[in-house]
């Protein structure tokens, strides 16, 4: 059983998946930093200094100034956090779309090259006939 697991774990697809997960985790951190440290301050500046991290609706208790205080006081709806996560998602989805589009373009180009290299059935038969005729002479 250990041998079977080793064969499974060391297959190319499993290793590729592990590498993808690691790169995805690092990419997620990078996107979070871009959104939180670059885009959200710019959006806040454009919208007149709105801080999305403290946008919330307090459902219970006294009105609080910050999200953390409001969560301590009672139930809250943190729609500012949702806006930030939505922007994160859109950036990741866009980058993945561009990556997949590029990979598909490369794959189509390779398939086209491979199909042009393969001879059709008629071409193969004509080549065989030519070779046979050349041997008879």
UniProtKB/Swiss-Prot annotation:
GO cellular component term of the entry, any: plasma membrane
Gene3D superfamilies: Large-conductance mechanosensitive channel, MscL, domain 1
Subcellular location: Cell inner membrane
Keywords: Cell inner membrane, Cell membrane, Ion channel, Ion transport, Membrane, Transmembrane, Transmembrane helix, Transport
Annotated membrane topology: Multi-pass membrane protein
Pfam families named in the record: MscL
Signal peptide: none
Entry's transmembrane regions: 15-35, 38-58, 80-100
GO molecular-function terms, A-Z: mechanosensitive monoatomic ion channel activity
Function of the molecule: Channel that opens in response to stretch forces in the membrane lipid bilayer. May participate in the regulation of osmotic pressure changes within the cell.
Membership in a protein family: Belongs to the MscL family.
Subunit structure: Homopentamer.
Name the UniProt record assigns to this protein: Large-conductance mechanosensitive channel
Organism: Bartonella quintana (strain Toulouse) (Rochalimaea quintana)
């Amino acid at each position: 059983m250990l041998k079977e697991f080793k064969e499974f774990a060391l297959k190319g697809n499993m290793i590729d998946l592990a590498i993808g997960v690691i790169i995805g985790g690092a990419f997620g951190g990078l996107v979070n930093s871009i959104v939180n440290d670059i885009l959200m301050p710019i959006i806040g500046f454009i919208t007149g200094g709105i801080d999305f991290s403290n946008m919330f609706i307090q459902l219970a208790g006294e009105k609080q100034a910050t999200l953390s205080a409001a969560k301590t006081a009672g139930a809250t709806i943190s729609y500012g956090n949702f806006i930030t996560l939505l922007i994160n998602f859109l950036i990741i989805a866009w980058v993945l779309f561009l990556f997949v589009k590029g990979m598909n373009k490369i794959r189509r180009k390779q398939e086209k090259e491979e199909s042009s290299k393969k001879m059709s059935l008629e071409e193969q038969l004509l080549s065989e006939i030519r070779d046979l005729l050349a041997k008879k002479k």
